[in-house]
Amino acid sequence: MTANELITGDFTDASEPFSLFGTWLKEAEKNEVNDPNAVALATVDPDGMPNVRMVLLKGFDERGFVLYTNFESQKGREMLATRKAALCFHWKSLRRQVRLRGPVEIVSDEEADEYFMSRPRGSRIGAWASKQSRPLESRFALEKAVAEYTARHAIGEIPRPDYWSGFRIRPLSIEFWHDRPFRLHDRVEFRRETPDGGWTKVRMYP
C-alpha cells in the first residue's frame, strides 16, 4: 500500500487493521499540531449512562490499545466494572477517523511500572497527590498535597501507586473512515468474534 493510496483514502486493500492504524498514526504525528495520540474514550456507568473524555494513547500492538489512569477515577471504575470500552481517534488535518471497541484487560505490573517510571517526576508526584474524579475543595488543597508528596519523595525513585495502572482495549471491531467529496466517504471495518480471532473486512456505506 503506497502513501498516495493512503492519502487519497484508497486504503481498502489492507488485510489487517494494526499496520494500517500504525501508518495513519505516523502520518498524524507529522500533521497534527497537538497530541496526535489523543483519543476519545467512552465508558458506561452502572446505570448504563455513557461517559466520554479525551485521553492519550500510550501504546498499541496486535494485543490492543493501551492507556494509563488512576483506577479510582470515573473511567477506571467504569472499565473495571464493565471490562468494556470504545475509542475514537479524529485527525482533522488528515480528514480521518478511527473507531474501535472491545473488552478491556489490565496490563501487567511490569508494563505499568515501566511506563510509570518513564513519566516526568512531577507527573509521578501528581499520581499520588490527585484523588482523581473526586470533589476538590480548592486549588490550594491540591497544591498542598503535591507539596507533601514532593517532600515525602524528595530522595530516590517514586513508586507506582497500587491504584494506578493501565488498561488494554482488545478490539473486536476497528473502523477506518476517510473523508471524500459530497459526503461519499470511505469506510472500512475490520471485525472478529474474539480478541484472538481472525479479522473479517467489510466495506461500509458512508
Swiss-Prot record:
Q: Kind of enzyme, top EC level?
A: oxidoreductase
| Keywords noted in UniProt | Flavoprotein, FMN, Oxidoreductase, Pyridoxine biosynthesis
Query: What are the names of the required cofactors?
Result: FMN
State the name under which the record lists this protein.
Pyridoxine/pyridoxamine 5'-phosphate oxidase
Question: Among the record's GO biological process terms, what is one?
Answer: pyridoxine biosynthetic process
Look up the EC number in the record and give it.
1.4.3.5
Q: According to the UniProt record, which cysteines are disulfide-bonded? A: none
Q: Which reaction does it catalyse?
A: pyridoxamine 5'-phosphate + O2 + H2O = pyridoxal 5'-phosphate + H2O2 + NH4(+); pyridoxine 5'-phosphate + O2 = pyridoxal 5'-phosphate + H2O2
Q: Which InterPro entries match?
A: Pyridox_Oxase, Pyridox_Oxase_CS, Pyridox_Oxase_N, Pyridoxamine_oxidase_dimer_C, Split_barrel_FMN-bd
List the source organism. Answer: Rhizobium meliloti (strain 1021) (Ensifer meliloti)
Q: Which GO terms describe its molecular function?
A: FMN binding; pyridoxamine phosphate oxidase activity
- PROSITE patterns, A to Z: PYRIDOX_OXIDASE
Q: How is the cofactor bound?
A: Binds 1 FMN per subunit.
